[in-house]
Structures are given as structure tokens and as C-alpha cells.
């Protein structure tokens, strides 16, 4: 049997190799190229206002929240019945725990009641640390086609920086109904529910150290995790 490829001129062998390479790349184009339109990126943008509390003299470091793997993502979560899923082709600008940390820092800054606040990664000289656990940050559907209710549930702990003692703990649960069953309306509901949660967290946190020093603060045990009701 004649082995043609072994005796072909170099130029022709190059053509065959090049043609084969093009065929391989053509067959893989669906794998290495874009599979569809890029996801729409949405900004978490709640409104912040000055807190209706007395100013404080201590400084605060805000830790990134603990979160389950299902919430530690930039995807926008939805809950229908017993199923946790995500909106297609929609993303937050960052993973949800990082967004929560950044927005809490911003909320304390815009409260105008605290001299210094920063993320723990910024190595601020803090008197207290705000630790959080993110339990819910999702759009919850009670019906197949109706507009969802956004649920934000954050457990907050104020911790003494010097002794690492938990001064107080509170569970903040906020909800907001979307006006319509579309992504912009759902994002608006996230902004509303998250904004209310941040405002409550700021007001409560600013009052805790003063209560601790006066002896009236009562540390509260972290409440048990909420169990989602499943559709019957």
C-alpha cells in the first residue's frame, strides 16, 4: 500500500494539515465561542438616609457575610415551591455576600453618625466588628405566573473587637413585593427590601454598644434557621 502522506511535497502536506485544523476548529466553534447573548448586569442600589440615632464615637469594621453556596454567587436567586433556581441571563455586579458587605459599609457611612467604618479587609482600627449571616436573598414565587415577593433575611452580630465577645445578635427579615413579574421590577423589589434591612441594621447596631456600656444590653442567641414552606 502506498503511503501518500509520507511522500507528499511539504507545501501540500501543510495544506492538508491546515485544512484539518480548520475543520476541527469549525466543529468546536460552538464550544469555545459565545453560546448566547451576555447576561444583563443589574446594580443593587437601595436608597440610604441619615440615621435617626445619636452619633457615636467608636469605629466599626464590617465583615463579609457567611452564606450558603446557593447564595454565594452573582446570579439572582428565585424560589418556587421547594426549588431554588436563578433568573436566566441576569446577574448582579458581584457575588451577593460581597454586595451586602459593600452596601452595609455605605449605609453606615451615609448614616452620618459614625466617625469611621470600613470592610474588615481594609484593616481599619475598629472598636466593634459587624458579623452577618445571609439566610435569604431571593425572589419567592407563590404562584406560577404572579409577581414574586423578594425576601431578605440577615442575622447580625455586633462583636467586641478587643475581646471577640458577641455583644448582641438580631435577625432582620424584610420583604417587598415586585410590581410585575419581570426582572426590572424584581430588582426594584430587591432594592426596597435590602434598603429597609440595611436601615434597620444601621439603627440597631449604632444603639447596641451604648446599651452594652450602660449595662442594659442583653445578648440574644442566634435564632434557628428559617425553614421555607414548600408548595403542597
Which residues make up each language-model segment?
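N-terminal secretory signal peptides
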Residues: 1-26
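A structural "domain/chain start" motif
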Residues: 29-98, 208-232
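Surface-exposed short loop/turn segments
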Residues: 29-43, 47-51, 111-162, 230-232
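Envelope-exposed proteins and targeting segments
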Residues: 56-58, 72-74, 80, 88, ...
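Short secondary-structure boundary motifs at beta->alpha junctions and helix caps
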Residues: 76, 84-91, 162-203
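Sec-exported extracytoplasmic/periplasmic mature domains
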Residues: 105, 109-113, 139, 202-210
Amino acid at each position: 500500500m502506498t503511503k501518500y502522506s509520507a511522500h507528499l511535497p511539504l507545501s501540500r502536506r501543510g495544506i492538508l494539515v491546515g485544512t484539518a485544523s480548520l475543520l476541527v476548529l469549525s466543529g468546536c466553534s460552538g464550544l469555545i465561542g459565545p453560546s448566547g447573548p451576555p447576561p444583563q448586569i443589574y446594580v443593587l442600589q437601595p436608597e440610604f438616609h441619615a440615621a435617626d440615632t445619636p452619633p457615636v464615637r467608636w469605629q466599626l469594621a464590617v465583615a463579609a457575610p457567611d452564606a450558603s453556596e446557593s447564595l454565594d454567587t452573582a446570579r439572582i436567586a428565585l424560589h418556587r415551591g421547594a426549588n431554588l433556581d436563578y433568573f436566566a441571563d441576569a446577574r448582579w455586579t458581584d457575588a451577593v455576600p460581597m454586595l451586602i458587605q459593600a452596601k452595609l459599609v455605605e449605609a453606615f457611612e451615609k448614616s452620618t453618625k459614625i466617625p469611621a467604618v470600613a470592610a474588615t479587609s481594609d484593616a481599619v482600627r475598629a472598636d466593634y466588628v459587624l458579623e452577618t449571616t445571609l439566610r435569604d436573598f431571593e425572589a419567592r414565587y407563590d404562584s406560577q405566573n404572579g409577581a414574586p415577593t423578594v425576601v431578605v433575611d440577615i442575622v447580625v452580630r455586633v462583636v467586641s473587637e478587643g475581646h471577640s465577645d458577641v455583644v448582641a445578635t438580631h435577625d432582620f427579615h424584610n420583604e417587598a413585593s415586585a410590581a410585575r413579574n419581570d426582572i426590572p421590577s424584581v430588582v426594584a423589589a430587591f432594592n426596597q427590601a435590602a434598603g429597609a434591612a440595611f436601615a434597620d441594621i444601621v439603627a440597631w447596631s449604632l444603639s447596641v454598644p451604648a446599651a452594652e456600656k450602660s449595662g442594659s444590653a442583653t445578648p440574644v442567641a442566634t435564632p434557628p434557621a428559617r425553614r421555607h414552606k414548600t408548595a403542597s
